[in-house]
């Protein structure tokens, strides 16, 4: 390319050949021949100028001709690479399937955990829940333990979302193991619209829950509908199992607290699991 910029070639470019399509080398030579004469260029004859032009033309064509370009390598031309990618895609799909299945299973387990745990606590008395579902013959044949007096305290709470008045009718009563007792809670709806509430409960100390038995299902875990300004009494019929007096862990326990909490029943609302607060 250095020959193109000798004084003679600059003269050709200055005279306007640069802006005219040269066509074939012969035609280009005819156009620039008057300017390549020795008296015009001072760098040699027309033959030398044609050699420069031919050299420039060949270089230009060589740089642009597709046949002279190095072959391009197509992506994914390696069959082993394609096979590996297909294997990776298959593994990723399998992993995503497993993850989705685990997520769905965990979601279903979370919805079933509350009722299952509630049933377990009511059956075993663990987690501070009273034991429910006892045969009447056991109640009739119980022998009260007269020398062991237990104080039962009652507590009532209302969640902030529920505008109810809820309180126990009695703050405390005294019972002995093997003796039945009846207590009442009172709830009132002071608003001007019907409200549905649902309650949960727990017992303190937690270890005493397995001895606190409800003779019949109380109002807990069931929806309670109160119309505007309606007020109702809610009974709790229970007894302390006589085995309470034989448990070494209960030797120093002379106070048991039964606590209820009411929540507004709404679609998608989950009750707290009965037990530890």
Swiss-Prot record:
Residues 1-28 form a transit peptide. Residues 118-277 are mitochondrial intermembrane. Keywords: Copper, Membrane, Mitochondrion, Mitochondrion inner membrane, Transit peptide, Transmembrane, Transmembrane helix. The keyword Mitochondrion applies. Its main location: mitochondrion. Interacts with CNNM4/ACDP4. Interacts with RANBP2. This is Cytochrome c oxidase assembly protein COX11, mitochondrial. It comes from Pongo abelii (Sumatran orangutan). The gene is COX11.
């Amino acid at each position: 390319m250095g020959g193109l910029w000798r004084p003679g070639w600059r003269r050709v470019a200055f005279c306007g050949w640069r802006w005219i399509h040269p066509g074939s080398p012969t035609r280009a030579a005819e156009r620039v021949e008057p300017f390549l004469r020795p008296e015009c260029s001072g760098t040699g004859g027309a033959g030398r100028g044609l050699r420069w032009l031919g050299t420039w033309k060949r270089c230009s064509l060589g740089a642009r001709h597709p046949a002279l370009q190095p072959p391009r390598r197509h992506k994914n031309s390696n069959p082993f690479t394609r096979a590996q990618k297909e294997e990776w895609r298959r593994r990723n799909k399998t992993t995503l399937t497993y993850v989705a299945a685990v997520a769905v299973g965990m979601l279903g387990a979370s919805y079933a955990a509350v009722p299952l745990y509630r049933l377990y606590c009511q059956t075993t008395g663990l987690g501070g829940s009273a034991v429910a579902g006892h045969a009447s013959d056991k109640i009739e044949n119980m022998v009260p333990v007269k020398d062991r007096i237990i104080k039962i305290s009652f507590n009532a709470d209302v969640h902030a979302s529920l505008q109810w008045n809820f309180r126990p009718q009695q703050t405390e009563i005294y019972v002995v193991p093997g003796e039945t007792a009846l207590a009442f809670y009172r709830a009132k709806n002071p608003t001007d619209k019907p409200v549905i509430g649902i309650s949960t409960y727990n017992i303190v100390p937690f270890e005493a829950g397995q001895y606190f038995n409800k003779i019949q299902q109380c109002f807990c875990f069931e929806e309670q509908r109160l119309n505007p300004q309606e007020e109702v009494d809610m009974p709790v019929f229970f007894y302390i199992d006589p085995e309470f007096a034989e448990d070494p862990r209960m030797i120093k326990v002379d106070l048991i607290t039964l606590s209820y909490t009411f929540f507004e029943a709404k679609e998608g609302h989950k009750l707290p699991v009965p037990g530890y607060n």
